[in-house]
């Protein structure tokens, strides 16, 4: 009937059936995700934000009623005291962990700098050694060239000497 009235809906484009692929390892899984993303490059990829690190509530600046665990406190007060104490212990433990992490990071950075300095020293030492060897080879090459040049000059002198010309004159006769 819809065809008769002229208000027919256009046919929806069917999606191509995708073969079922089960990733065997992490690289296959990554490849499949990338292929899926690249099918429609205009669509924005969802990048999850990093979860915030847990931190305890800050300690109150002013506590109006300071309670203790003494025998004079009522039973309701003890629970309040216990919760406050637990929160304070959590806060102190958190601060200790942050401090420890900071110390470890500083030690790591210091160690990295020491290693980098040692590597640079080794590299400089090796570079100097290479340069010395290169210079030594260059000097040997120059000495060999000079020696060859002197030898050629010696031969030229012998050829131009009067004794050699006398010998050649004798040979001509």
Swiss-Prot record:
Q: Where is the composition biased (Basic residues)?
A: 124-142
The annotated region (Required for RNA-binding) lies at: 50-142
Chain intervals with Basic and acidic residues compositional bias: 143-173
Q: Where is this region: Required for nuclear localization?
A: 125-137
Q: Keywords assigned by UniProt?
A: Coiled coil, mRNA processing, mRNA splicing, Nucleus, Spliceosome
Presence of the UniProt keyword Flavoprotein in the record: no
Q: Where is this region: Disordered?
A: 1-27, 115-173
Query: Which positions form S-S bridges?
Result: none
A biological-process GO annotation: RNA splicing
Q: Which Pfam families match?
A: DUF1168
Q: Name its cellular compartments.
A: Nucleus; Nucleus, Nucleolus
Q: What is its main location?
A: nucleus
Q: Which domain of life is it from?
A: Eukaryota
Q: What InterPro entries would the database entry show?
A: Prkrip1
Record keyword Metal-binding present: no
Residues folding into a coiled coil are 99-161
Any one GO CC term of the record: nucleolus
Q: Which GO terms describe its molecular function?
A: double-stranded RNA binding
Summarizing the function annotation, the protein's role is: Required for pre-mRNA splicing as component of the spliceosome. Binds double-stranded RNA.
The subunit field of the Swiss-Prot or TrEMBL record says: Component of the pre-catalytic and post-catalytic spliceosome complexes.
Protein family per UniProt: Belongs to the PRKRIP1 family.
In terms of PANTHER family, this protein maps to: PRKR-INTERACTING PROTEIN 1
Q: What is this protein called?
A: PRKR-interacting protein 1 homolog
What gene makes this protein?
A: prkrip1
């Amino acid at each position: 009937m819809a065809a008769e009235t002229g208000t027919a809906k256009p046919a929806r484009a069917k999606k191509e059936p995708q073969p079922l692929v089960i990733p065997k390892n992490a690289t296959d899984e990554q490849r499949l995700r990338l292929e899926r993303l690249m099918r429609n490059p205009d669509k924005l990829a969802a990048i999850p934000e990093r979860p915030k690190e847990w931190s305890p509530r800050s300690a109150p600046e002013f506590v109006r009623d300071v309670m203790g665990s003494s025998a004079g406190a009522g039973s309701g007060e003890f629970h309040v005291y216990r919760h406050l104490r637990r929160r304070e212990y959590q806060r102190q433990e958190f601060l200790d962990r942050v401090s420890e992490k900071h110390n470890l990071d500083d030690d790591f950075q210091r160690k990295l700098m020491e290693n980098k300095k040692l590597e640079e020293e080794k590299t400089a030492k090796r570079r100097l050694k290479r340069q010395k060897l290169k210079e030594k080879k260059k000097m040997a090459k120059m000495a060999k060239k000079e020696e060859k040049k002197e030898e050629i000059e010696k031969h030229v002198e012998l050829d131009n000497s009067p004794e050699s010309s006398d010998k050649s004159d004798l040979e001509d006769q």
